[in-house]
Amino acid sequence: MRQNPARRAALLDAAIEVLARDGARGLTFRAVDAQAQVPAGTASNYFANRDELLTQAGARVYERLEPEGGSPAGSPEERGDRARVAELTHEVVERVSTYRTGFLALLELRLEATRRPALRAVLTERIRADVDANIRLHLGDGRPGDATSVELLHLAMNWLILERLTLPDVFPEARLRELVEQAVERLVPETRGEVPAEG
């Protein structure tokens, strides 16, 4: 059966909305059809089974999280500056937080991956590739710090975003911005080759 790529993308976007709203248990072909406002049976014509739908929904979240115009880069003068790392980190936090349903859907997929080895393999590969790409960009642009700095920022910002989107009253917005600045200051040296001072 011939398939429409735009329709497939719309169905995956609907699946992401269902995951964020109803959790993985609520993700059914019928729920996706209803969310996408398409005739019953449409989603089952595009996806062989629920596992395929879950896996492709995870990939779609990452598609939508990509920055427009590719990876951000500064001028050669600012690429190696810790302030630029802080600026980029704020941009990532804002971009991911703005796509709230995508982040929440990804949390549901992560939980589901603990029970579905195929989904776990796909998410592991995708997230590891994302971390590796961030490391390559960071080092390639001559930014301060090393691969461990990037990995620690990845872990810290993921939890900060989780807190912001699920329990927003724990930290006020102004404090979250300060915490991003502090994370960069403590995890990334001022210049390349230095080790951050002990706090």
Question: Which stretches of residues belong to each language-model region?
Answer:
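Short, basic, alpha-helical segments at the C-terminal edge of helix-turn-helix-like DNA-binding modules
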Residues: 59-65
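Secondary-structure edge/capping motif, primarily at the C-terminal ends of alpha-helices
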Residues: 76, 110-113, 164-168
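Helix-turn-helix
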Residues: 10, 14-52, 56
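Hydrophobic/aromatic-rich alpha-helical bundle segments in the mid-to-C-terminal region
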Residues: 120, 124, 139-199
